Design a protein with these regions (language model features):
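Membrane-interface loop-to-helix entry segments
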Residues: 118, 149-207, 238, 261-265
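Hydrophobic transmembrane alpha-helices that form the core helical bundles
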Residues: 39-42, 54, 61-158, 163, ...
Length: 359
């Protein structure tokens, strides 16, 4: 490994427990809690099973969190899972993990969350679309120019947040703290207003879909439906391990890193269960099945519009904007430490291991 240049900075352990918890929440809460109620309702056709799937996925994620936290406390360094793979297995598996994240996993996550951000803007302020002739152009079966306006907004967001987070961890941390505070307050407001709304009914939570057949929804069929629903829920929990990527910047990581992972995951579980309870309290499950089959709506938006009217739709759209903006920012910020660790270990482009002496 080459010696760093003289003007090379170094990573500083400046992230405390509270900030680490905020970053866990930031990197997890994105689109899943708003969009996945519809496909999960379609698969399970029962409110109680939908809530059970969210709980089961949360408990499995928590088990993963606790296992990861044990390793993170022993190997707290920049790079997170990459460092764990390298130490526990070997460089080859670490190499595969890192490049898979660069080529597919982190890249796709950032792109998909940014795209939902752009879609949310489009629902508030219509974005001009490309012409039909341009939209119909197909390259290897892919319509790159379809919804071009939305895609350009998503690209612009990624470029802006990459530049913004390039200015240092403290700036990204402050942004996440502000946005998480707004996000949690808005979610608690929706939960409170939903529970107090006269539009809701406990009967909605007790009534299965008109399509529900208790005889067929049992055994292997039930297991398959639960597995498919849990896949949707796991998308909502994805990203809890990302804070391990900044293990080299967390104060007292042997204590704070496991605590941040555990506390953050428990907070997310509680918010997800309460939000989905309100969804199913306000609307019967068949409404969510219809939303899924129509392919033209978001379950959370339909719920809030139902009990708060048009301004409720604006509120939930703004909340989705905040969460997707924040999740995109945190994913870009935290993933950069993975590629830094790879470059430092001569498994990635060498210039990526440069640390600005100021930022």
């Amino acid at each position: 490994m080459q010696n760093p240049p003289e003007n090379q900075g170094k990573l500083v352990r400046s992230i405390g427990l509270t900030s680490a918890v905020v970053l866990v929440i930031s990197s997890v809460i994105g689109t899943g809690v708003f969009k996945k109620i519809a496909p999960m309702s379609y698969e399970l056709q029962s409110p109680s099973l939908v809530l059970f799937a969210w709980l089961a996925a949360g408990l499995i994620s928590l088990a993963g969190t606790l296992s990861n936290a044990e390793v993170a406390s022993m190997l707290a360094d920049s790079g997170g899972d990459f460092v764990y793979y390298r130490k526990i297995y070997n460089r080859f598996f670490a190499f595969l993990f890192g490049w898979t994240n660069f080529a597919v996993i982190r890249t796709a996550s950032i792109a998909s969350i940014a795209y939902v951000f752009a879609q949310s803007i489009n629902s508030l302020i219509p974005i001009p679309n490309s012409s039909q002739e341009l939209s119909d152009i197909s390259i290897f079966g892919l319509h790159f120019f379809d919804n071009l306006g939305i895609k350009l907004i998503a690209i612009a967001l990624i470029v802006f947040l990459t530049y913004f987070n390039n200015k240092g961890m403290k700036l990204g941390e402050k942004l996440s703290t502000t946005l998480v505070s707004l996000m949690v307050m808005a979610m608690l407001l929706i939960i409170t207003l939903g529970l107090l709304s006269s539009s809701g009914s406990l009967e909605h939570l007790q009534q299965n879909s008109v399509r529900y057949n208790p005889e067929s929804m049992s055994g292997s069929t039930l297991f398959k439906a639960l597995a498919l629903a849990c896949l949707s829920a796991f998308w909502g929990y994805e990203g809890w391990n990302s804070v391990g990527y900044i293990g080299g910047e967390i104060k007292n990581p042997q204590r704070n890193l496991p605590l941040a992972l555990t506390i953050g995951t428990l907070i997310i579980m509680a918010l997800y269960l309460m939000m989905n309870f309100v969804y199913l309290y306000i609307l019967p499950i068949d409404e969510f099945i219809n939303i899924y089959e129509a392919k033209n709506g978001i379950g959370a938006v339909a719920v809030v519009k139902h009990f708060l009217g048009p301004w409720g739709g604006t509120l939930i759209s703004c909340l989705i904007l905040v969460t997707t903006f924040n999740c995109t920012s945190s994913t870009i910020l935290l993933a950069s430490r993975l590629f830094y660790a790879m470059a430092k270990d001569n498994m990635f482009f060498k210039k990526v291991d440069y640390i600005h002496p100021v930022y």
